[in-house]
């Protein structure tokens, strides 16, 4: 009986191997860009070690050039774009063809092509247009949205003051502050930083960010077909996403119970519910409960973690480089003084501060591999034929860290974004939010939050580290879909903005 079972297992493995070889042979590799030869079952696992996927792709680009093909597992070919020229040519020059959303295997089972982020085609166009207009009506990009961020920044400063100079990890508070801005837009609610449920939701958002970026997440990207039913890190990620989903469902149910069908939308959930009521008799409508939930869950996750991670990394940089912190505070003192709260209109008066924020985003490269794209139709690109549905990784980190564009890219140097007269200058290679039709939905909100949270904190405090600045590490502890900076302890001390300033 045991022998029969052994032979059955061997036969199954042999058939799987033959199937892998057959499928690999029908992938029309001759029409895709060149790349390392994939192994049966393993794909390019030998060249792409989980936990170091981005660095592995950059290493392969030195051999295969700026456009090449890799296999994540046996059946998932991905075309990789490296450098500004290739990424711009694809995402900008052939924007429609490269406008599809690719796969994030760890989240695929949850979102399943629904919501504004993971949908494609007509569903995506309708949801994106509706979401952008609704958020704009709610104040995003307007004075109301700015006042919302300013109020939350003041709450954050008051909470920082409560630490009374003691070292603390600011990551949770920063995430709660940015999440409150998003929750105000999504649900019309602001939560206390002491609210246990709110803390759990914010931690779940952080756990999701870590889960999709970790070594386990990268392994799952390659072998989800095999790992999905097994225990592993992906099960923990599902728990985090379930926490976000349960919280969102509760908020939606409360809105359904007190929705004013004749009144204006109070928030994005209201706007969705009103639109769903309008489309109730349309059997082909994309304004469904699932699309609403998946849109809101993603915005809650992304809006919580992306901005807070970047603000935290910028604070870490200013502790490591006290002279940069000093120059930022002097500029704030010179231009705003002690009594004027920072506003978005002050950005042009604060060129050095703006340069620091841009350089921090460049150095962090929060999404080094870009969010995966997929081809919406069969496309000719650089002499290759990319079939419809081909996945694409546009490596944004390869642009932000390109030594041919940014000299000594591993160094923190805000002067890259200043001209000879000290005025802020834009850089066409600054693409942390990607480009093309899938450019980040919340780019405007994120920029406003970064500027207002950062300047409000620096106007109120000097930042100190409990350990010597030169011992602080800037290297991401996790690098996958997202770069996650190291945790750190922060000490804040009220600053005297009436002190004498000096010219840089």
Swiss-Prot record:
It is a peripheral membrane protein. It catalyses: all-trans-retinoate + reduced [NADPH--hemoprotein reductase] + O2 = all-trans-5,6-epoxyretinoate + oxidized [NADPH--hemoprotein reductase] + H2O + H(+); all-trans-retinoate + reduced [NADPH--hemoprotein reductase] + O2 = all-trans-4-hydroxyretinoate + oxidized [NADPH--hemoprotein reductase] + H2O + H(+); (5S)-hydroperoxy-(6E,8Z,11Z,14Z)-eicosatetraenoate = 5-oxo-(6E,8Z,11Z,14Z)-eicosatetraenoate + H2O; (12S)-hydroperoxy-(5Z,8Z,10E,14Z)-eicosatetraenoate = 12-oxo-(5Z,8Z,10E,14Z)-eicosatetraenoate + H2O. Its cofactor is heme. The keyword Membrane applies. Expressed at higher levels in extrahepatic tissues including trachea, lung, stomach, small intestine, colon, kidney, breast, placenta and spleen. Expressed in peripheral blood leukocytes. Constitutively expressed in skin (at protein level). Belongs to the cytochrome P450 family. A cytochrome P450 monooxygenase involved in the metabolism of retinoids and eicosanoids. In epidermis, may contribute to the oxidative metabolism of all-trans-retinoic acid. For this activity, uses molecular oxygen inserting one oxygen atom into a substrate, and reducing the second into a water molecule, with two electrons provided by NADPH via cytochrome P450 reductase (NADPH--hemoprotein reductase). Additionally, displays peroxidase and isomerase activities toward various oxygenated eicosanoids such as prostaglandin H2 (PGH2) and hydroperoxyeicosatetraenoates (HPETEs). This is Cytochrome P450 2S1.
């Amino acid at each position: 009986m045991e022998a029969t079972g052994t032979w059955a297992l061997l036969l199954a493995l042999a058939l799987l191997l033959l199937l892998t070889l057959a499928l690999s042979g029908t992938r029309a590799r001759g029409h895709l860009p060149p790349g390392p030869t994939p192994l049966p079952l393993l794909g390019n696992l030998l060249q792409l070690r989980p936990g170091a996927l981005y660095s592995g792709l950059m290493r392969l680009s030195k051999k295969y050039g700026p456009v090449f093909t890799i296999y994540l597992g046996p059946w998932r070919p991905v075309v990789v774009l490296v450098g500004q020229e290739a990424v711009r040519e694809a995402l900008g020059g052939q924007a429609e063809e490269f406008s599809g959303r690719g796969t994030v295997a760890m989240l695929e089972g949850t979102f399943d092509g629904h919501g504004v982020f993971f949908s494609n085609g007509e569903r995506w166009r309708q949801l994106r247009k509706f979401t952008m207009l609704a958020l704009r009506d709610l104040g995003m990009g307007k004075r109301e949205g700015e006042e919302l961020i300013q109020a939350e920044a003041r709450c954050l400063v008051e909470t920082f003051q409560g630490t009374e100079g003691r070292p603390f990890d600011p990551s949770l508070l920063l995430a709660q502050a940015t999440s409150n801005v998003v929750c105000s837009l999504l649900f019309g609610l602001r939560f206390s930083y002491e609210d246990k449920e709110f803390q759990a939701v914010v931690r779940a958002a952080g756990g999701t960010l870590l889960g999709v970026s970790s070594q386990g997440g990268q392994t799952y990207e390659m072998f989800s077909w095999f790992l999905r039913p097994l225990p592993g890190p992906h099960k923990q990620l599902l728990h985090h996403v379930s926490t976000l989903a349960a919280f969102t469902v509760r908020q939606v149910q409360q809105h359904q119970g007190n929705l004013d069908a004749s009144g204006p939308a109070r928030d994005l959930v209201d706007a969705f519910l009103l639109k769903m009521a309008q489309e109730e008799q349309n059997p082909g409508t994309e304004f469904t409960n699932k699309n609403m939930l998946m849109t809101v869950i993603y915005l809650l996750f992304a809006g919580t973690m992306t901005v807070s991670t970047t603000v935290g990394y910028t604070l870490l940089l200013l502790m490591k480089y006290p002279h940069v912190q000093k120059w930022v505070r002097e500029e704030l003192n010179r231009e705003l003084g002690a009594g004027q709260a920072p506003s978005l209109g002050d950005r042009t008066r604060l060129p050095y501060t703006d340069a620091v924020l841009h350089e921090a985003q460049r150095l962090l490269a929060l999404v080094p591999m870009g969010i995966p794209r997929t081809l919406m139709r069969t496309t000719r690109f650089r002499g290759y034929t990319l079939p419809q549905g081909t996945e694409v990784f546009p490596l944004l980190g390869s642009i932000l860290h390109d030594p041919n564009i940014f000299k000594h890219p591993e160094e923190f140097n805000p002067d890259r974004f200043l001209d000879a007269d000290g005025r802020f200058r834009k850089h066409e290679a600054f693409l942390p939010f990607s480009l093309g039709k899938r450019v980040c939905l919340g780019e405007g909100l994120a920029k406003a939050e970064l500027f207002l949270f950062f300047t409000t904190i620096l106007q109120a405090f000097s930042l100190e580290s409990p350990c010597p600045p030169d011992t602080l590490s800037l290297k991401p502890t996790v690098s996958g879909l997202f770069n996650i900076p190291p945790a750190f302890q922060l000490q804040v001390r009220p600053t005297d903005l009436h002190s004498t300033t000096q010219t840089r």
